[in-house]
Each structure stands twice: as structure tokens, then as C-alpha cells.
A protein has these predicted regions:
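Hydrophobic residue at the +6 position relative to the catalytic HRD Asp in the kinase catalytic loop
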Residues: 236-238
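Juxta-kinase regulatory segment immediately upstream of eukaryotic protein kinase catalytic domains
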Residues: 2-45
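ATP-binding pocket architecture of kinase catalytic cores
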Residues: 49-226, 240-244
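Active-site activation/catalytic loop segments of kinase-like enzymes and analogous catalytic loops
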Residues: 262-307, 321-331
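Catalytic-loop of the protein kinase fold
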Residues: 226-228, 233
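A generic structural signal for residues located within well-ordered alpha-helices
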Residues: 27, 92, 122, 149, ...
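Activation of the activation-loop gatekeeper triad in protein kinase-fold domains
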Residues: 250-255
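All-alpha amphipathic helical-bundle segments outside canonical DNA-binding/catalytic cores
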Residues: 178-179, 310-321
Length: 331
């Protein structure tokens, strides 16, 4: 396990955002190139030389930078191998991003979807490229000069999520994206079933006790909203000169409609806090707790102020997110 003292977020070298394509993750780029030149909207200039790089830092879907000269686009497809039913839904992500950009500037615009597996080996879609910095455990060099950087990006993220949760899905014809009635109950029951499939005797009773506690205190949603389902700092991008505003949010393939506090609970689950065990790495990136980020209670205050939601029961949502994460890690 990483320990926080192993990483200095303001001195160590950040991971590169682009790399050559990893072994075993190349596509048939000749077929892809021909398809994109023929199928992308006419306003996109595809006359230049074709080139491919990979965004290497994601842990799930495969994400590539495809270029036609100066034109840069992002191609996404599921990972190779067996996939869980409903996971890595490129059609859903395309559906969301082909509409959401119209009312939410932090959503990249999707241009093209293809479910013909002879093109990329699986369903895939293409979207605009956003340029900026993704903050993981190490602060990008282009942002190290900012005062109070951690606090500012925390406030910006809380404001961005609150704005996202205020949107009306009907404004972009996405009101049928999910089934908000009974959403929270289905989340708990669904993750209980997943846990039962991989249950470990050492933790079985504790997980069942947590399930019973969650079910006994099931919250009533305050509004129906978009739910991203994987909101965390490293799914967000900032422009180097502006830590006070999120430039883009990524990984929309699990987006649905439901209780927005499910999203906020997910964020809290990933968020480091000064009171955390120093050997626990929240969010998967050592160094985050040395970045000056707001505490979880401060982040909750910022989000409550912007969203106008009652967060007196926020601990239920955080507990659910932790219980869900335990099930994910056991799989």
C-alpha cells in the first residue's frame, strides 16, 4: 500500500497524460481512420495526417487521442475481455454527451457513435478533445504557482457538481435516461446482490449488518436529477490558469437519473480528510491529502450552499458509497 509520505504533490513529477498505445490495446487503425474520415460531421476537418496516442491513466474504458493534422478528437471503447452486463456502456455515454453539452459546458460534445464491432472491435464513440490538467496525486507543474490551490479546486468541484445536479433532463430530451422512482432502493438492493455473489466469510456479517442499517434508514430524494455515478477529482479537468472553475468532467457511461446525493456521497468516499488514517489512500492517489484540499465537512458545506439541498443526512450517502466500494473491491 502507498503511504502518503511517499509522494510530494508539489515536487514529484506527474504522470504523462499521453503515451504510445499500450501493448495489446491497439485497434485496426487503418479501418478506424477510414471510418472516421467517412463518418464524422463535415464541419470536422479530417484532411490532415492521421495519428494515434493513448490516455494511459484511466482504469476502465480505453481512451485514445486520434488526430487528423491539427484536429484532435477522443475515441472511447470498452476494455478488452469479458464485461459485466451493462458496464462500459458507450451508447449511453454517447447519448448523454451528444445532448448535455448544450446546457452544461463542462460536458464534452460527442460527435459519433458506432456499434459495428468490425470497426473498433466493440462499440465506440468519438468526442471533442478538451485540453487542460487532470489532478491526481501530484499537482501538474502548470498549476503549482497558484495560492491555496487545493481549497480552490475543492470549491470549484463542489460548484460544478451542484450546477450539474440543478439541470433539467427534459431540456435536452434526456428525461427517459433512467428510472428515478425507487432509484435509491434499487441501488442498495443491486449492490447487495453483487456482494452476495463474491462474499468473503471474513466480512460477510459486517457487510450484511451495514446493508440492514442502510435499508432501515433509506432516505427520500429531494429532487430528481442527473446522476453521474463516478464523480471524483480525477474525472475532472482544469485549465492551468484557472483553478476556480472546472473545465471538463469525464467518464459519463454510467449516467442516469435519480437522487443527486448518491453522486455527492461517491465524491465524499473518494475525498481525503485531515482526520484520515495516514496510511489510507483515498481516491486511489497518494499525495491528495497533502494538497490542501478542503475537508469533507467543508466540501459538504460548499456543496450545500450551491445546491440548496438539505445535507443533514449526508452520512447515509457516504456510508452507502463506502459499502458499495467494498463490494467493488471484492469483485
Amino acid at each position: 500500500m502507498w503511504k502518503h509520505e511517499d509522494v510530494d504533490p508539489f515536487s514529484d513529477e506527474p504522470q504523462p497524460e499521453l503515451a504510445v498505445v499500450r501493448d495489446g490495446e491497439d485497434l485496426d487503425w487503418g479501418i478506424v481512420e477510414s471510418f472516421l474520415r467517412d463518418s464524422l460531421p463535415q464541419e470536422i476537418d479530417t484532411a490532415g495526417k492521421f495519428a494515434v496516442h493513448q490516455f494511459p491513466n484511466g482504469a476502465a474504458n480505453l481512451t485514445y487521442l486520434v488526430s487528423f493534422g491539427a484536429t484532435e478528437l477522443v475515441l472511447r471503447r470498452p476494455p478488452f475481455g469479458n464485461l459485466a452486463p451493462g458496464a462500459h456502456d458507450m451508447g449511453r455515454e454517447y447519448r448523454v454527451l451528444s445532448k448535455l453539452w448544450e446546457i452544461f459546458p463542462m460536458a464534452p460534445r460527442a460527435y459519433l457513435f458506432c456499434d459495428d464491432v468490425t470497426i473498433a472491435g466493440a462499440a465506440m464513440f468519438v468526442m471533442e478533445r478538451r485540453v487542460g490538467e487532470v489532478i491526481r496525486g501530484i499537482v501538474p507543474r502548470s498549476m503549482r504557482h497558484h495560492d491555496r490551490l487545493g481549497n480552490r479546486i475543492g470549491r470549484a468541484l463542489a460548484a460544478a457538481i451542484a450546477e450539474f445536479h440543478s439541470l433539467n433532463p427534459s431540456d435536452v430530451e434526456l428525461e427517459t435516461l433512467g428510472k428515478p422512482d425507487g432509484f435509491v432502493l434499487r441501488q442498495v438492493e443491486g449492490w447487495k446482490k453483487r456482494w452476495d455473489l463474491v462474499s468473503d466469510e471474513r466480512y460477510h456479517q459486517g457487510m450484511n449488518d451495514l446493508y440492514a442499517a442502510l435499508i432501515s434508514d433509506l432516505p427520500e430524494p429531494q429532487r430528481v436529477a442527473f446522476v453521474h455515478n463516478d464523480l471524483k477529482l480525477d474525472n475532472c479537468m482544469f485549465k492551468p490558469d484557472n483553478p476556480d472553475e472546472v473545465h471538463a468532467i469525464f467518464d459519463w457511461d454510467m449516467t442516469t437519473l435519480g437522487d443527486p446525493l448518491i453522486d455527492f456521497g461517491t465524491l465524499l468516499n473518494y475525498w481525503p480528510d485531515p482526520d484520515d488514517d495516514p496510511d489510507v489512500v483515498r481516491g486511489g492517489h497518494a499525495g491528495l491529502n497533502q494538497m490542501g484540499l478542503p475537508s469533507r465537512s467543508q466540501l459538504t458545506e460548499y456543496y450545500a450552499e450551491k445546491s440548496l439541498l438539505d445535507l443533514s443526512n449526508v452520512h447515509w450517502y457516504e456510508a452507502f458509497a463506502q459499502w458499495k466500494t467494498a463490494s467493488v473491491l471484492q469483485q
